[in-house]
Regions:
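Viral RNA-dependent RNA polymerase
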Residues: 1-403
Length: 403
């Protein structure tokens, strides 16, 4: 979003990406840098994530950070890879990822229905996914994207490789001014974080598929016929990934031949520490994915969020938050947690009490009136989930050509 910080060194020009991109100084510099082939120029800045963390994580002193990419890197990636990202968003869930996924408008039903073919499988929790990304995996994802982007000009390939090489040896600056170089790990917070994470997770899924296929058919990997393997994979395994989140279901033959422990060995072999979210194969409706399990509402699959997390999200660390912003927050949580009936009733009571408390004082306040317009009824939220809407019809997304 253009309202976010612009990254180093552009703070001296403006506080947001929009302010920086509108400045003549940035525009002139960017044109010269672009014409030169986008040579390496990034110093990434890092900051702590402000979030509510489980007590167990705090006791282990486990904190999370994100990395801020310079605005010129973000803009160049958007210009070069934007169409590729659009195509990925239009392709879910057929390609096994959830980029572009929207739980509303029957999106959750569409996503989960894929797992009816094989009802039992597993969901995994990979620890420190971004920081565990190995160099070979970064290189693979980079070359994969460049190949699929199918650049027509050699100069664009040079630009793409220069931009993506910033991930391999990243110069990082901490809030207190220390500078160091990072040689591995996927930078959290850059333009392609989700894309790289999904591609890495998909690759690991296919590595697992190759192992299973070779053992069942007593073949060596180098002897596999690709077309035959792909047909087998699509018939025997169903999976979906979003970043480090993954859920998979397997055919009865695979579940009878391999234990869940056998399946998870692929992660440490690829450099990741993994923990199964169940002790054995479980039904797809109780597998956590994107922070949700699945329930059925009026014959549709719908998301059921963890109640404890939703209750924690009501806590606001900023005591100066104005009543209109709090009301918007309550409405947003109500939409997310709609299918937890008891919690939904609690939220409706909280919203009613909050409006009663502040409505007279803020009755002429524009922000308060705007916040009141976000107060959807139960029926409106239900329609938001259960009414189909094709948000991005094929061919509807156009981008200006980079010249």
């Amino acid at each position: 979003p253009h309202s976010t910080v612009p990254g180093f060194p552009w703070y001296v020009i403006g506080q947001t990406k929009k302010q920086v991109m509108e400045s003549a100084l940035f525009q002139n510099w960017f044109v010269n840098w672009w014409n030169a082939g986008c040579p390496r120029s990034c110093i990434w800045s890092t900051a702590l994530k402000e979030e509510i963390r489980p007590v167990s994580k705090l006791l282990e002193n486990k904190i999370r950070t994100f990395i801020i990419a310079p605005v010129h890197h973000v803009l160049a990636c958007e210009m070069l890879f934007g169409i590729f990202l659009d195509q990925m968003m239009l392709s879910w869930p057929a390609l096994g990822h959830a980029i572009g996924f929207d739980k509303f408008h029957l999106g959750w039903n569409r996503l989960i229905s894929r797992f009816e073919k094989h009802e039992y499988g597993s969901a995994e929790d990979v620890k420190q996914w971004d920081s565990s990304f190995k160099l070979w995996l970064l290189v693979f994802c980079s070359e994969f994207i460049i190949t699929l982007a199918n650049f027509r000009r050699d100069q664009d390939k040079i630009r793409a490789r220069n931009l993506l090489s910033e991930l391999f040896e990243s110069i990082i600056m901490t809030p207190d001014g220390e500078v160091f170089m990072k040689f591995t790990g996927n930078n959290t917070g850059w333009w392609g974080t989700a894309v790289f994470n999904c591609l890495g997770n998909i690759l690991i899924s296919f590595v697992l598929g190759v192992r299973i296929y070779c053992k069942l058919n007593k073949e060596r990997p180098e002897d596999i016929q690709i077309d035959k393997f792909i047909r087998w994979f699509l018939d025997e395994i169903t999976f979906c990934v979003m970043g480090d989140d993954k859920m998979s279901t397997y055919s009865l033959l695979i579940r009878q031949t391999f234990t869940l422990t056998d399946m998870l060995k692929v992660y440490p072999d690829c450099g990741f520490e993994v923990e199964s979210l169940s002790t054995d194969y479980c039904h797809f409706r109780i597998m956590p994915f994107l922070g949700c399990t699945t329930t059925v509402y009026k014959n549709y699959y719908v998301p059921l969020l963890d109640r404890e997390r939703m209750q924690a999200s009501l806590i606001e660390s900023n005591p100066s938050l104005e009543p209109p912003a709090v009301l918007i927050r309550i409405n947003a949580i109500l939409r997310e947690a709609f299918f937890d009936r008891d919690f939904r009733q609690d939220l409706l009571l909280i919203r009613e009490a909050w409006i009663s408390k502040w409505n007279i004082l803020y009755e002429d306040d524009k922000e308060w009136l705007d916040a009141l317009r976000t107060c959807d009824s139960v029926g409106e939220i239900e329609n938001l989930y259960l009414t189909f809407e094709r948000l991005w019809p094929q061919g509807s997304m156009n981008r200006s050509t980079v010249k």
